[in-house]
Amino acid sequence: MGLNIPEKPVNTLWTDDQWKAIQANGNNILVAAAAGSGKTAVLVTRIIEKLVDETGNLNVDELLIVTFTNASAAEMKYRIGKSLEEALSQNPDSSHLKKQVALLNYASISTLHSFCLEIIRKHYFEADIDPNFRLIEPIESSMIRDEVLEELLEKEYSIANNEAFFHLVESFTGDRTDAELHMLISKLYDFSRANPNPDLWLEQMVNFYDTKDINSITELPYFPIIKEDIELRINQAKSYLLNAIEYASENNGPAPYLETLENDLAQINTLSNISWTNWQDVKLRVESMDFKRIPSLKNKSDYDEEYVEETKRFRDAAKKEIKNVLVDWFSREETNYLADLEKMKPDIKTISELVKNFANNFFEEKQRRGVLDFNDLEHLALKILLKNDVPSDVAKSYQKQFKEVLIDEYQDTNMVQETILLLVTNSEESKGNLFMVGDVKQSIYRFRLAEPTLFMTKYQEYQQNGEGEGIRIDLSQNFRSRKEVLDATNFIFHQLMDKHVAEIDYDEAAELTLGANFPKSNHMATELLLIDMKSNENESEDELSPQELQKNQVEARAIATKIREMIDNKFPIYDKKLQQNRSIQYRDIVILSRAMTSAPDMEEAMKVQDIPFYASNNSGYFETTEVATMIALLKVIDNPYQDIPLAAVLRSPIVGLNEEELGQIRMAKKKGYFFDALLAYKDITVSAAADRISDFITQLNNWRELSIRENLTALIWQIYQETNFYEFVGGLPGGKQRQANLRALYDRANQYEKTAFRGLFRFVRFVERLEVRGDDLGTAKTLGEKEDVVRMMTIHASKGLEFPVVIISGLSKKFNMRDIYSKTLLDKDYGFASNYRDIEKMIVYPTIMQQAIKQKKSREMIAEEMRVLYVALTRAEEKLILTATVPDFEKTSKNWLQVSNQKETILPASIRAKAKCYLDWIGNTIIRHTSFKDLLCEERIQTLPTEMKLQIEIKTKEMFLTTELEEHKADNWLENVKAHEPVPVQSAYKDEIERFMNYKYKDVAATEIRAKQSVTELKRQFSLQDSWSDTSILKEFQKVSLDRPKFLQQNKLSATEIGTAMHTLMQAVSLTYKPSEKDLTSLLQSMQEKDILTEAQIKAINIKQIMGFFDSPLGETVLQKSDQVKREVPFSYLLPVAKLYKQSDLEEHVLIQGVVDSMIEEEDAITLIDYKTDKIEGRYANWEAAEKVMKERYQIQIKLYAEAIQAITGKKVSNAYLYFFDGQHICQINIEEGF
């Protein structure tokens, strides 16, 4: 069937392939959309094109659109809705478009789980389930699962003569617990659920152990895996020998070794012609390999030492490969290998039945509770859609309803999901209506049991011309990244990806081509930053005395230094929205890593460089101090007889005991529970610690009672309130994050209580299980998407995102091979494999099946890691920076050189398949770039033609020891000071510091004037300023005055504090009558009771001085006009700078603030009164002398008050008075004169 595609409009921006993907019809379609190729836009446009075409008569509810996440589904629905509204605005009379807008909310645009839920809700009777079921979260599902599994195992243990089960327990558990069996059943259950028929898969798993009719290992279904692995290792050994021969053949090479090496190679070549029909023949051929001893070199000085060592190294590597083949595949007789499998068959059958029983019990328990979990949705939908292995009537109704089924991220589909989708699509081969979009090079979810082979099978079967099984369309044009990023990605992956190792070829159809339009730049070359961790032979012990930095720390510092340079140098970034270059911002940079283990080191390095940083970590929640403390406290409330949690709480800020006090508690009762010792210590000891313990015991008892009466969240919040722990952690470094973590604990407890489980005990047990299983929770998120910070995230978390600058870190970190070396291995094709345990002889050894599946899983893991690296490289829009540490760059580069002289573009499969980290791949590819050849000055390197721009930096770890060395020097400086010796004035930042210190700001005068000042401060300044002074001299006399805390005010008060107390009383005293001494005493007593004044302040107040004011003429006026008196009047007023400072010609203003003690506001005038507590009597010869000083001191203040009040009220200030309590003196201020 050919393609039927309308001609592309002349003015369209779509590429030919994009247009084809939008318009193609008539068959199933697979769109292989490379990174950044605009697949979402193509998918949305295809949908819109179909919906706006009124001749096609397609409604939006006749489409099934499946996305990978709920967020993607919401975005898809939003885009479609927006496009429909735009189309309707251009054609407002279209009833068809109006109908589509109305139907959009009913359209099936969702994740597959959501679609399955819709099927179950509509057709629950077909699955024989209660329609009122509740969908539970994984948290509740895991708790039900654990209970059901424990009940199942308890039942098996209780059955008499249950020999098969007990043999299984002995074979698959440790000496003390059956936790391994518990976990194995759970793993097998989860794995089986990724298959359309879990029970059938479990039964087939048993069949792989049936070897009665198998006479040779070559007849085993997984023998091709074994054969491929042996061939791979033989080829690797051959490659090593060819390298050895090359070194021996060099001028000054160890030529006497050549005869032995060529004999080795001849033997290896004979292994390439093995007949694989007979296992014993293969074994004999490999065992016959005889590596002769290489001859001794008579005159060693005639030979290049490096060539000799490299020749030996490569030959030893070849010998090791052959030895490993013998150990892994031929260490036991063929009959024993086959017998092992037959002996294990009863155990495999028993565990298969256990898993099936558990699955039934688990589902029945959920049914009893009226709940379903997410794993149930797909299988129940499948049960509804498939009856007796054929599509049910429900499935046929969906086939009629959906004119097209569109699937995004198809590469991450598993077998169950594939079966469901095929059941709701058109079953007629000539009318395929399945539209799949994805990129198998970005399939990185195998750990979630995604099956990329589904995509790859269709990719190979479908044809670009539309003939055959379906239509294949390749979208390779990248609209995200600069050419420099694409060239780097292509250069690396043309050498790495092919079907043998990566499960897909990186050919012309797969390579990335430029589609984005960026302005030219000379700054965007891909950078490879390698830090050589080899120690400098010339460095002294003193230089290394600080603790040697770990690899993560060194690399983090190198990255932080790089970022700081980019920010400081205003690295240019093209802003697509502004359509112009701008300086780089922190938010433009992301650091990607395979895992987040280096995040703490990265955060520390960023702090040193003053770089705002955020790491989105999905683990470590339970390890945070604040959460660990709260969990420990909850455990103690549940049961105080738990020594470790109790000690943690006592040592925490909640109680605040130190180590010595904890030791004294234990001495109070040396044996038994620590809680008993705590009670004993409390009763026999009189101390501050005993008081704190007594208070804690009281609180603990109250909390224990509360945990019974109230729900868990009420308990947690009560603890936060009573202990102030929430506020306390807020004051610690990272307080915002810590408080968010505590809120998250409250929220998670709330979420827990919404399940069928209740109570503190079960919650604590649930948390313990999470910790044991390693199912940690991520720390609470406190960062918004738009905050200007450098972000760090995993490569998986970055999928689908893009960033201007991407730094890929930790490239030398080893791949996580933990699953591969597990005792038990699971595989979709061959089921379950483990080592064989001979219970009678107490011997454990690997089975042939375990070895085969181990190799298969290893190859799958390598293929997935290669795809993860592809995802990482393709996140960059403009610049790509690759960073790694190497133990010894000279030795590492020599390893890379072994393949640098080959002519083929693709690297040998053995090199790619045996990689231990991303740097193994990157190093072996980048070394064939001209930049690396120039760096190493190595003529043997066969460079590959490329336009890739590469910048290589090799740095030593010493470059990043600065902090430790500077701390070390600082210690020496301290010693110099103690010894009264000069401190050396040397610094790596000397020039930079001098530049900063000598910098002169052009508007110095403006910096001497505060933008906001109090009247009191201005008064002090003017008392110091005269005709020859300038404002800068005032700084020498300015002093910050802060209120002392109240507990310090309990002692002798300062003059300022006494004045404050007097003013407070004058503000509170009634003016409706003349107060008596009794009135004032009563008022002061009331103010103390209300905590307005302290006892010390009241004692400092002279009541007779207060009464003296009301006896004065000024006081009498205040009493007479009390209804016009305003007290403590605050004001703010803008005053020209030139009016304050005679020498200033600035046109700026200063905001002055003050408080008028008292003012009498009449209709046309205002009288100001300011109270003073200055010492007068006995200090001056007479009042006249005192008055002169006081006028000079306070004139500026009162004039500022007057000008401000006049400007604010619009009334003239006619009089202004100072009243001095000491001596009852009244001083009138002349406010007519200027400043």
UniProtKB/Swiss-Prot annotation:
PROSITE patterns: UVRD_HELICASE_ATP_BIND, UVRD_HELICASE_CTER. The keyword Transcription does not apply. One of its GO terms (biological process) is double-strand break repair via homologous recombination. The keyword Isomerase applies. SUPFAM superfamilies: P-loop containing nucleoside triphosphate hydrolases, Restriction endonuclease-like. Residues 12-482 form the UvrD-like helicase ATP-binding domain. CDD domains: DEXQc_UvrD (cd17932). GO terms for molecular function: 3'-5' DNA helicase activity; 3'-5' exonuclease activity; ATP binding; ATP hydrolysis activity; double-stranded DNA binding. ATP binds at A33, A34, A35, G36, S37, G38, K39, T40. Its EC number is 3.1.-.-, 5.6.2.4. Its cofactor is Mg(2+). Keywords: ATP-binding, DNA damage, DNA repair, DNA-binding, Exonuclease, Helicase, Hydrolase, Isomerase, Nuclease, Nucleotide-binding. One of its GO terms (cellular component) is cytosol. Pfam families: PDDEXK_1 (PF12705), UvrD-helicase (PF00580), UvrD_C (PF13361). Residues 509-800 form the UvrD-like helicase C-terminal domain. It catalyses: Couples ATP hydrolysis with the unwinding of duplex DNA by translocating in the 3'-5' direction; ATP + H2O = ADP + phosphate + H(+). Belongs to the helicase family. AddA subfamily. The heterodimer acts as both an ATP-dependent DNA helicase and an ATP-dependent, dual-direction single-stranded exonuclease. Recognizes the chi site generating a DNA molecule suitable for the initiation of homologous recombination. The AddA nuclease domain is required for chi fragment generation; this subunit has the helicase and 3' -> 5' nuclease activities. Heterodimer of AddA and AddB/RexB. PANTHER family: ATP-DEPENDENT HELICASE_NUCLEASE SUBUNIT A (PTHR11070:SF48), UVRD / RECB / PCRA DNA HELICASE FAMILY MEMBER (PTHR11070). This is ATP-dependent helicase/nuclease subunit A. The lineage of its organism: Bacteria, Bacillati, Bacillota, Bacilli, Bacillales. The gene is addA.
